[in-house]
Amino acid sequence: GLINLYAIDDAHEREAKGMYDDFLLGGTDSEMVNDSLGPKVQLYLNSPDFVTGDLVNETPRLTVLLEDADGINTVGNGIGHDLIAVIDGEASMTYTLNDYYVSDLGDYTRGTVSYVLPELTEGKHSLVFRAGDMMNYATTVAVDLEVVKGLRPRILEVGTTHSPAYE
């Protein structure tokens, strides 16, 4: 590689220039283990208890837990390099979710996608989610869901916490 440098010191009316060419940009880690597997994917809508075919509201929250030793690919650099959700196989209902991926703190191998789906019509739908790792191995997961208009969330537990603030 080559980097050309230029600097100016307005206070002393001086200029400087230079170059640096002793670096490599790109390449491959020779010690990397190629597992040839896509990311582990756990997907649910609204609740971790979701199973394929469950009932959901019109705007369910899609949550996807991802893990891969090579890291999760969110580069968005062409086909297969995005986190994608597709509803009912429709191109018009394809959502790129790269911007909704958050890595676990200090861990490039794991993270979560959290995205509220746009309003869906009442009835049965399918959702396909695709994720790839940094070695371009992909995993695709499909689930079915049934949208029920006006469905209210299930409240599983209500708790209170003492406020630490006082006068």
Question: What is each residue range found by the language model?
Answer:
Residues G1-N4:
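Short, surface-exposed ligand- or partner-binding patches at beta-edge/loop junctions that are enriched
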Residues G27-P60, E146-E167:
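Short, compositionally biased P/S/T/A/G/V-rich stretches that sit at domain boundaries
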Residues Y6, H12-G26, Q42-D49, T63-K149:
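Long, low-complexity serine/threonine/glycine- and acidic-rich segments characteristic of extracellular
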